[in-house]
Swiss-Prot record:
Family, per entry: Belongs to the NusB family.
PANTHER family per UniProt: ANTITERMINATION NUSB DOMAIN-CONTAINING PROTEIN, N UTILIZATION SUBSTANCE PROTEIN B-RELATED
Function description: Involved in transcription antitermination. Required for transcription of ribosomal RNA (rRNA) genes. Binds specifically to the boxA antiterminator sequence of the ribosomal RNA (rrn) operons.
Pfam families: NusB
Keyword entries, A-Z: RNA-binding, Transcription, Transcription antitermination, Transcription regulation
Example GO BP: DNA-templated transcription termination
SUPFAM superfamilies the UniProt entry points to: NusB-like
HAMAP family for this protein: NusB
Name of the protein this chain belongs to: Transcription antitermination protein NusB
Alphabetized GO MF terms: RNA binding
GO cellular component: cytosol
């Protein structure tokens, strides 16, 4: 449950950045750190350092790889333009794809399940199914592709 709470904070952070049109600015490391610090000041009630640490890792990793992640979303989101996607759904996909591709310590099935549950809570049932389908395809195709490339 701690990690789900952290993922919910990541969604809030990414959503706020996009609504404030800060997505490109936060690619600057110093600006990103300032924004993360401000975010935790606004969410001062969260005292659990494990939650904050995991959330920070996901935020930093997602932002660091956001261009690659967005290209992957566009590749797998058949007939959907990423710019027209629901902001919540797009950002759930972003941090989940980061987890699937760059966090081998987290089983991709766990990541997908968490993304679906968060989508059900913050978006729609249709969004949950949409996110599940995209992440499942990405996990199977990208992970299998990477494993076969390693051989």
């Amino acid at each position: 449950m701690k990690r789900r709470k952290a993922r919910e904070y990541v969604l809030q952070f990414l959503y706020a950045c996009e609504m404030n049109e800060n997505t490109q600015k936060i690619c600057n490391y110093n600006f990103l750190q300032e924004e993360i610090e401000k975010f935790w000041e606004r969410n001062y009630e969260e005292q659990n350092s494990d939650i904050k640490s995991f959330a920070n890792q996901l935020i930093e990793g997602t932002i660091e790889h956001i261009d690659i992640i967005d290209k992957i979303i566009q590749k797998y989101a058949d007939k959907w333009n990423i710019e027209r996607m629901i902001t919540i759904d797009k950002n759930i996909l972003r941090f989940s794809i980061y987890e699937i591709l760059y966090r081998q310590d987290i089983p991709y099935q766990v990541t997908i399940n968490e993304a679906v549950e968060i989508a059900k809570k913050y978006s729609t049932k249709e969004s949950a199914a949409f996110i599940n389908g995209i992440l499942d395809r990405i996990a199977k195709e990208e992970i299998c592709h990477n494993k076969s490339a390693e051989k």
